[in-house]
Design a protein with these regions (language model features):
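Extended amphipathic alpha-helical elements
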Residues: 1-557, 565
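Alpha-helical lid/collar subdomain of P-loop NTPases
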Residues: 420, 427-431, 435-438, 446-447, ...
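Phosphate-binding P-loop
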Residues: 573-574, 582-588, 853-855, 862-869, ...
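Walker A/P-loop
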Residues: 586-618, 635-636, 871-902
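Conserved alpha-helical scaffold flanking the Walker A/P-loop in AAA+ ATPase domains
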Residues: 625-646, 679-686, 863
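Conserved catalytic/switch belt of AAA+ P-loop NTPases
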Residues: 635, 650-687, 692, 698-701, ...
């Protein structure tokens, strides 16, 4: 009793619940320790009850002493205990006895509920305080739009994450039964955060749409002229967007800015108006695209720039390569103007290799830009056809090499060939087919058969190939060298075909070995030819046209300008791809090459397009591509008659693939029905039946989708395997001027096969097709610099000097051992550039590096690699001198006069 009595005198503010708890338990123990004989005594019973009640009360007192107790909770306690008392928030001198007198142990469950509610409410209260503190400090991040003072707003990534987390927290608080006291405040925060989220989304969409449309509507006179109402509408939107963005930025605080009165409704209205402008612009551009379908493959910004500057053709020239794939620019007549004060286009410049081709006749750039760009395209095709008709005649009148190197008359007799490279290849292909078929006619001649005609044809082709190889060893300009190298590639393939037919004893042109080859012909088309009435202006006087026959497919040559670039080395695998692909096109289907990476799926498709002179666009598919973009591509392909090669098509998401089935089926059905117009995505467009679609796939790779069955049925599959590297090496060596190409190709392939198997597995090692091509280019350079040196030595030097920079030290012994085995007794010295090495030495001294021989060699090797590579990795352990290596080379180049900057 003394303990309880003394406890009652303790001030509530100074009460220590732990001490009380320990003291009360000691009292209980002391009472229990009394002798059993006193337990029947009334005093014992009273003391025992008092101590137990006190023990049961102490935990409740601890709960009531918590900081979470507010006046509302003390008032609730008064109601539960039905006793009136002055709570501690009113009476700072309240004693513990005042609380003990409430007999809390009799209401323990109610007291615990009150205290639990107080604790939960405190948690909500603290969360609200944290929300206020956090959102009072969150401000906008800003980038200025182009060179203006218009702010483009965004939130920091961590602030956006806080927004999402806080929205979930507020939802959780509203779901709590303890939120009643804070209901209005929490609901207000829910509204605030929802506004922040909505406004943030609107700001992102508005900024994206506005910044896309602003240069088009404000900066494009064409849009203002063609869409006056929408241009006026956008002017108002432009003012509103800038005002709202500047206001939000001036407020700084995200919460305050996003919760301005009426802001959300104003943003909704702005977004609606922007969508109207965007739709009008899209409809306008689609109208222009329908007039000149190649505009489907240009971005809207580029297209509007073209349309805006259409009356000034000089300003449109920078977009030439986006409209005509292999054309860099047009040459305009600076002296004479048309009746509309426009220039004439007199020639075009190749974007692939080096070549200029003069229009026949020159083209007046009159009218709307979409009209005269179509006229330019037609004029290109007509010019190529005119060149073909002359080239076919000239081929019969000159020796082959004279015809090949024949130049135009003044003013550029030394630069421009009389025929574009594309026409030279076409003429060669036409005459090769004619010569082989003439050999077959000689074999089967009824009165005077010549069974050796095909062998004689082979001998003639071998000599022609040797002549071309010898021609590469003479001094040629870049344009002529490229042309001759491509001719060698084509001639080598032609020779291999005739060798195969001789080996198989082929005696007739109807044999499959011959029918399965791409055969270029210049003749009057037979009745079973495809598109027999197409392009009557591209016919000879007797109705002849250039066409390609393979098996039962006969298609016209399309005269798309290809430039003066390299062509693919054709292997037996390529021939099989050509047969399947052309059969698919003949059946009005698409084609689907599938196989591992690096096997030539895309390149074979592009080369087939080159053989047929078709415009071929390559699209890299990704999961981000949507059905609208894909629909525009199909519209462009269908109406322009172009080919589309969709790389890694199975990376598209299943939803897009499903829509693609409908889109491409509309094209296929239109081609089969010989329709002049088709409907894709509710748009009616013209249909050119020579269009084609190719999809390449890497089966079994991660992240790939399964094609819908309906889509599979529209494409003919082709399985593509690893190409014949030996044959590719042989052809490329011949093109570089090597006469012992067959032997050297076998050694080359053997070396790379052994290196792949025997050297350590390093991430930077590459013994594939790309590495092969790079070494052959180096070997060709050595051959031209030292034509009298043994060819084995030249190739060995290229293999050694190109590969040794990337070989790690532990592999060097194996590498040199294999080189020695394949090229015994051959060890040509490294090609030295004394001038470069002197500049490297001076650069080392200027940078404070010790110019030892090994370091200087690495710098020189880096320079040699950069001559044939766009990018080089400099690898090695820390402190090996990687940075100093490239810095020294940059300094050496600057000393040499080639100013080199680095960042």
């Amino acid at each position: 009793q003394r303990f309880v009595h003394s406890s009652k005198e303790i001030l509530w503010s100074e009460m220590d619940s732990n001490e009380l708890d320990e003291g009360s338990k000691n009292q209980v123990k002391a009472i229990k320790a009394l002798h059993k004989c006193v337990r029947w005594c009334p005093a014992y019973k009273a003391a025992d009850k008092l101590s137990k009640d006190f023990v049961n009360t102490i935990p409740l007192i601890s709960l009531l002493a918590a900081k979470c107790m507010r006046d509302r909770h003390w008032n609730a306690l008064k109601i539960v205990t039905k006793k009136d008392f002055t709570p501690p928030y009113e009476d700072k001198n309240m004693l513990l006895g005042n609380i003990l007198s409430l007999n809390l142990h009799e209401f323990s469950a109610d007291v615990e509920d009150i205290c639990d509610q107080a604790a939960k409410e405190l948690k909500i209260e603290n969360t609200i305080i944290q929300l206020k503190e956090r959102w009072s400090g969150i401000e906008w991040l800003m980038e200025t739009y182009k060179d203006t003072d218009v702010p483009l707003l965004k939130m920091a990534e961590e602030d956006f994450e806080s927004l999402e987390a806080d929205q979930l927290t507020v939802q959780g608080m509203l779901a709590s039964r303890f939120v009643k006291q804070f209901q209005e405040e929490v609901q207000e925060w829910q509204k605030h955060l929802a506004n922040v989220a909505d406004v943030f989304v609107f700001i992102g969409e508005i900024q994206r749409t506005w910044s896309y449309l602003e240069p088009l509507f404000i900066g494009s006179e064409e849009v203002k002229r063609e869409l006056p109402e929408d241009a006026k509408r956008f002017e108002g939107i432009d003012v509103n967007v800038k005002h709202e963005l500047k206001t939000c930025w001036e407020i700084k605080n995200v919460d305050q800015a996003c919760n301005q009165d009426g802001l959300l409704s104003r943003f909704e209205n702005i977004q609606e108006q922007l969508e109207i402008c965007k739709k009008s612009l899209s409809d306008f551009l689609d109208g222009r695209r329908r007039q000149f379908p190649r505009y489907y493959f240009t971005s809207e910004a580029d297209l509007l720039d073209i349309l805006s500057n259409g009356s000034t053709p000089e300003k449109v020239l920078k977009h030439t390569a986006k409209v005509y794939l292999s054309c860099k620019t047009l040459v305009l007549d600076k002296n004479e103007r048309t009746s509309e004060d426009r220039p004439y286009a007199t020639a075009w410049v190749s974007g692939v290799g080096v070549e200029n081709v003069a229009f026949e006749p020159r083209v007046p750039l009159n009218g709307k830009v979409e009209i005269y760009q179509q006229v330019v395209l037609d004029a290109m095709k007509q010019t190529l056809f005119n060149n073909l008709t002359r080239s076919v005649v000239r081929y019969q009148q000159m020796s082959r090499n004279e015809w090949l190197m024949h130049k135009k008359p003044e003013p550029n007799p030394k630069e421009d060939s009389s025929d574009p490279a594309q026409i030279i290849l076409l003429t060669l292909a036409i005459n090769y087919v004619e010569e082989v078929e003439q050999a077959f006619r000689s074999i089967t001649h009824p009165s005077n058969p010549n069974p050796n005609a095909l062998k004689l044809q082979l001998d003639r082709q071998v000599e022609q190939l040797k002549d071309l190889i010898r021609l590469t060893q003479t001094k040629l300009n870049k344009s002529d060298r490229t042309r001759v190298m491509v001719c060698i590639t084509m001639d080598a393939h032609s020779r291999d075909i005739v060798i195969g037919m001789n080996r198989d004893g082929v005696q007739d042109a109807s044999a499959f070995q011959w029918q399965s080859q791409l055969k270029h012909k210049y003749r009057k088309p037979p009745p079973n030819a495809s598109f027999i009435n197409r392009d009557p202006q591209l016919r000879g006087d007797a109705g002849q046209r250039a066409e390609i026959a393979i098996c039962d497919a006969i298609v016209p040559y399309d005269y798309e300008y290809l430039g003066n670039g390299p062509r693919l080395v054709i292997t037996p695998l390529t021939d099989r791809i050509y047969v399947t692909a052309t059969q698919a096109l003949n059946l009005k289907m698409g084609c689907a090459p599938a196989g591992p990476a690096g096997t030539g799926k895309t390149e074979s498709t592009k080369d087939l397009a080159s053989a047929l002179a078709k415009c071929c666009y390559v699209f890299n598919c990704s999961p981000e591509m949507d059905y609208l973009g894909l629909g525009n591509i199909f519209k462009g392909l269908a109406s322009s008659g172009s080919w589309g090669c969709f790389d890694e098509f199975n990376r598209l998401v299943p939803e897009v693939l499903s829509v693609c089935t409908v889109q491409f089926k509309a094209v296929c059905d239109g081609v089969k029905a010989e329709s002049a117009r088709i409907v894709i995505e509710s748009d009616e467009i013209s249909l050119d039946p020579t269009c084609g679609a190719f999809i390449t796939m890497n089966p079994g790779y991660l992240g790939r989708s399964e094609l819908p069955e309906g889509l599979k049925a529209l494409f003919r599959p082709i399985t593509v395997m690893v190409p014949d590297l030996v044959l590719i090496c042989e052809n490329m060596l011949m093109a570089e001027g090597f006469t012992q190409a067959k032997v050297l190709a076998s050694k080359f392939y053997g070396l790379y096969s052994l290196l792949r198997d025997l050297l350590s597995k390093q991430l930077h090692y590459d013994w594939g097709l790309r590495a092969v091509k790079s070494v052959l280019v180096v070997a060709g350079g050595f051959k031209r610099m030292e034509p009298d040196l043994q060819e084995e030595a030249l190739l060995m030097r290229a293999l050694r000097d190109f590969n040794i920079p990337k070989i790690v030290r532990e592999d060097e012994v194996v590498f040199f051992g294999l080189l020695g085995d394949l090229f015994p007794g051959i060890d040509p010295p490294r090609k030295i550039n004394p001038q470069l090495e002197e500049y490297v030495r001076l650069a080392c001294e200027q940078l404070g590096n010790h110019p030892d021989e090994v370091f200087r060699l690495k710098v020189v090797q880096l320079e040699e690699l950069l001559e044939i590579r766009h990018c080089v990795f400099v690898m090695g352990p820390p402190g090996a001198g990687k940075t100093q290596c490239w810095k020294t080379l940059a300094e050496a180049r600057s000393l040499k006069g080639d100013k080199t900057k680095y960042v």
